[in-house]
UniProtKB/Swiss-Prot annotation:
Residues 77-147, 218-288 form the PAS domain. Residues 353-431, 528-563 are annotated as: Disordered. Residues 292-335 form the PAC domain. One of its GO terms (cellular component) is nucleus. It comes from Homo sapiens. Efficient DNA binding requires dimerization with another bHLH protein. Heterodimer; forms a heterodimer with ARNT, ARNT2. InterPro entries: bHLH_dom, HLH_DNA-bd_sf, PAC, PAS, PAS-like_dom_sf, PAS_fold, PAS_fold_3, SIM_C. This is Single-minded homolog 1. Residues 1-53 form the bHLH domain. A motif (Nuclear localization signal) lies at residues 368-387. The lineage of its organism: Eukaryota, Metazoa, Chordata, Craniata, Vertebrata.
Length: 766
């Protein structure tokens, strides 16, 4: 009996083993592997294989476990699949809703060191980091489907990062942390729906499983990665503030490395992609490595390039604490939407810079070369507008000119000045390197004359004999030379056309503008070197200078006055002003009359008065309608006297209103005129031949302006130094020997053009 029972048990075990052997041969595995499997592994692999039939009913062949005739095309397909797995640089895996690995390719051993047989049929939770269990559960969970029940199958995209166990040697494992390696998994969750026979509009769905591809992230050591022409790397702190950038970033994005250092990566990323970048940054801090989605990196000259980054946290070798972030970035496209500016960094970077600074004693050859180089560099770096320009506007006017309720003041235009060819330059003796923005106000500029009602209506006037041509030249000096062939169209840009540093042009310059030339003779022909505003990034605003001009000194000019000298000069002038004020307060009105040669009377500012039509040179003027008349005007020695006093309320427009309605900032173009006054020597010891016989007028609108901005040059708040009363008193005390140029700005509608304009009027008076 015992022998029979032993034989029966042996036979049963042999039959069982043969069945397991036959079952193992049915598995899609090499015979070398299946022959060494134990029974538990065969059962585990078989159940996993059966589950795969639910996911892929048509599976790996015509019928599971049945051999069939194979065609040459099928053999090619199998070989192609094998090669794809080898070149994938990753592994494919299928996970059931309960976390069981139904299938994983044999290439997993290359990245993890774990065999295919060991992983198949086991739970994936045994091979991932404990902190990633919740994330894996969320990935495998299917929510209520939003698709119609008539759709039988659909996929839900999944992309996530897992820290999987890695048993490779350190030299082959790459970057690991605690025996885990970051794997980027991307794939889809497959959902199948079924409809009920009794209720065709109701149904149920089945979560079939997750099909994904796992990729190993590149190692952190940059020396192990060959940087191609479309790649650059950067090193950043843990908050993504850039510390170091590869030089290739200049070729790919336009930014130099020093332009991006100490700035965060978020400042140079498209606003729609910052959320994805933030998520990637969070994953990087948690898991140590991450691959970002495709995002748009803003280029320097407008537009963007599509980039994908592989970032890694580098730990300190001594303390094993996170030290910094190293990222390898792949630039996938060329610059798209060139000229479209989405960042202030792009706006400031895309503006052409006009530099006029040179050495203290430049030669004529250097000046000529500098002018040519400025012209060529400016043409090559012309600014491109981020918004479409409409043909209905003037070709040189920005879009903000039309939209601004201030009528697009020429002091607040946003576009950069454009360069003229030498043939189109306004004058031969002036090197007007910048062409001024043409403004649609057909009223031009007027310099230092009295007006009657008839001239105010006719939009032009005649120069009297007392109106000297030099004053118009002085106005053209500060406001720019009118462009020839454009009639009353004036370039109202607050740029300073510089003269060429040659003796011939200097003599012509002094002969044409003797009053300004006299000022330069007193001060050694030195120009002010403050930056002037030509454009503004904000529509209708006069702030934030874009194109900057720095003037040059003439060849024979001495050193420019320093800030200390200017401060001493201004302090001395303040003392003189106070002394004159005290004397004028004590002196009666007849003494004032004896000092100035005439009694102090109120004359008119843009008022009606009767005067025979004078003869002289025709000068187009502003149509100053609806101006309030004053009482009378006083004449002295056949010359018109401008008013001594103008209240702030009587001025046409305060300078502070030149800026946009949403801004309280003063136009820097007006500030230039004030700074030119501050630089001028206002001592009464000049010769009479260096100044005109009639001193210019100081308008009351400058009182608030000087109160606010007198400190810009000296550093002290000289509150009462440059108000209209003080300047008038000083002018009387100096017997009219002082020359000053101030801007008087007036907002005036132009019905012919359909929007408002701004004209700048320079007047001269006692």
């Amino acid at each position: 009996m015992k022998e029979k029972s032993k034989n029966a048990a042996r036979t049963r075990r042999e039959k069982e083993n043969s069945e397991f052997y036959e079952l193992a041969k049915l598995l899609p595995l090499p015979s070398a592997i299946t022959s060494q499997l134990d029974k538990a592994s065969i059962i585990r692999l078989t159940t996993s294989y059966l589950k795969m039939r639910v996911v892929f009913p048509e599976g790996l062949g015509e019928a599971w476990g049945h051999s069939s005739r194979t065609s040459p095309l099928d053999n090619v397909g199998r070989e192609l699949g094998s090669h794809l797995l080898q070149t994938l640089d990753g592994f494919i895996f299928v996970v059931a809703p309960d976390g069981k690995i139904m299938y994983i390719s044999e290439t997993a051993s290359v990245h993890l060191g774990l065999s295919q047989v060991e992983l198949t049929g086991n739970s994936i939770y045994e091979y991932i980091h404990p902190a990633d269990h919740d994330e894996m559960t969320a990935v495998l969970t299917a929510h209520q489907p939003y698709h119609s029940h008539f759709v039988q199958e659909y996929e839900i995209e999944r992309s996530f990062f897992l820290r999987m166990k890695c048993v490779l040697a350190k030299r082959n494992a790459g970057l690991t942390c605690g025996g885990y390696k970051v794997i980027h998994c991307s794939g889809y969750l497959k959902i199948r729906q079924y409809s009920l026979d009794m209720s065709p509009f109701d149904g149920c769905y089945q979560n079939v499983g997750l099909v994904a591809v796992g990729h190993s992230l590149p190692p952190s050591a940059v020396t192990e990665i060959k940087l191609h022409s479309n790649m650059f790397m950067f090193r950043a702190s843990l908050d993504m503030k850039l510390i170091f950038l590869d030089s290739r970033v200049a070729e790919l994005t336009g930014y130099e490395p020093q332009d991006l250092i100490e700035k965060t990566l978020y400042h140079h990323v498209h606003g729609c992609d910052t959320f994805h970048l933030r998520c990637a940054h969070h994953l990087l801090l948690v898991k140590g490595q991450v691959t970002t989605k495709y995002y748009r990196f803003l280029a320097k000259h407008g537009g963007w390039v599509w980039v994908q980054s592989y970032a890694t946290i580098v730990h300190n070798s001594r303390s094993s604490r996170p030290h910094c972030i190293v990222s390898v970035n792949y630039v996938l496209t060329d610059t798209e939407y060139k000229g479209l500016q989405l960042s202030l960094d792009q706006i400031s970077a895309s503006k052409p810079a006009f530099s006029y600074t040179s050495s203290s004693t430049p030669t004529m050859t250097d000046n000529r070369k500098g002018a040519k180089s400025r012209l060529s560099s400016s043409k090559s770096k012309s600014r491109t507008s981020p918004y479409p320009q409409y043909s209905g506007f003037h070709t040189e006017r920005s879009e903000s000119d039309h939209d601004s309720q201030w009528g697009g003041s020429p002091l607040t235009d946003t576009a950069s000045p454009q360069l003229l060819d030498p043939a189109d330059r306004p004058g031969s003796q002036h090197d007007a390197s910048c062409a001024y923005r043409q403004f649609s106000d057909r009223s031009s500029l007027c310099y230092g004359f009295a007006l009657d009602h008839s001239r105010l209506v006719e939009e032009r006037h005649f120069h009297t004999q007392a109106c000297e041509g030099g004053r118009c030249e002085a106005g053209r000096y500060f406001l720019g030379t009118p462009q020839a062939g454009r009639e009353p169209w004036w370039g109202s840009r607050a740029a300073l056309p510089l003269t060429k540093a040659s003796p011939e042009s200097r003599e012509a310059y002094e002969n044409s503008m003797p009053h300004i030339a006299s000022v330069h003779r007193i001060h050694g022909r030195g120009h002010w070197d403050e930056d002037s505003v030509v454009s503004s990034p904000d529509p209708g605003s006069a702030s934030e200078s874009g194109d900057r001009y720095r003037t040059e000194q003439y060849q024979s000019s001495p050193h420019e006055p320093s800030k200390i000298e200017t401060l001493i000069r201004a302090t001395q002038q303040m003392i003189k002003e106070e002394e004159n004020r005290l004397q004028l307060r004590k002196a009666p009105s007849d003494q004032l009359a004896s000092i100035n040669g005439a009694g102090k009377k109120h004359s008119l500012c843009f008022a009606n008065y009767q005067q025979p039509p004078p003869t002289g040179e025709v000068c187009h003027g502003s149509a100053l309608a609806n101006t309030s008349p004053c009482d009378h005007i006083q004449q002295r020695e056949g010359k018109m006297l401008s008013p001594h006093e103008n209240d702030y309320d009587n001025s046409p427009t305060a300078l502070s209103r030149i800026s946009s309605p949403n801004s309280d900032r003063i136009s820097k173009s007006s500030l230039i005129l004030a700074k030119d006054y501050l630089h001028s020597d206002i001592s009464p010891h000049q010769t009479a031949g260096d100044h005109p016989t009639v001193s210019p007028n100081c308008f009351g609108s400058h009182r608030q302006y000087f109160d606010k901005h007198a400190y810009t040059l000296t550093g002290y708040a000289l509150e009462h130094l440059y108000d209209s009363e003080t300047i008038r008193n000083y002018s009387l005390g100096c017997n009219g020997s002082h020359f000053d140029v101030t801007s008087h700005l007036r907002m005036q509608p132009d019905p012919a053009q359909g929007h408002k304009g701004t004209s700048v009027i320079i007047t001269n008076g006692s």
